[in-house]
Amino acid sequence: MKIIGKFPKTRLRRVRNEDWMRRLVAENNLSTNDLILPIFIREGKNQIEKIKSMPDVYRYSIDKIDMIIDKALNLGIPMVALFPYTPNKKKNNLGSEALNENNLICRALRKIKKKNRNIGIMCDVALDPYTSHGHDGILKKNKIDNDETLKILVNQSLLQAQ
């Protein structure tokens, strides 16, 4: 092969000509190290509830979390993300349950951390699981009040980080 010029005037493309070569020299690989396992949690004991809107996905009561975490660790998954299901009776316009130190997320976090496992835990800092209107913020005059929402989200973050 004769090279006509030098970089930057000549840019060789031979490693991009064929699909197999592009796959061979690709910079990115996906492994279990790149995965985060979502865990949907609910109130109760000994509960595994099918989520109708998501095939083959379930909500688990806190006492079942160990089983899920063990599976994640055995598969080499380094992190889980917790998503709470809040019953309507615990929801209100201000999302007050988000600031309850004994809410579902906080109890699940304490249970996972108590075992001191080598797994990362991610939680959603959001109000939509806790508000009766389903928005991710405090509504005032049919608009989200960002300042009030941020105050609550800061406190929710601090609570989850404990």
Task: Please provide the spans of the model-predicted regions.
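Alpha/beta enzyme core
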Residues: 2-10, 18, 27-36, 42-162
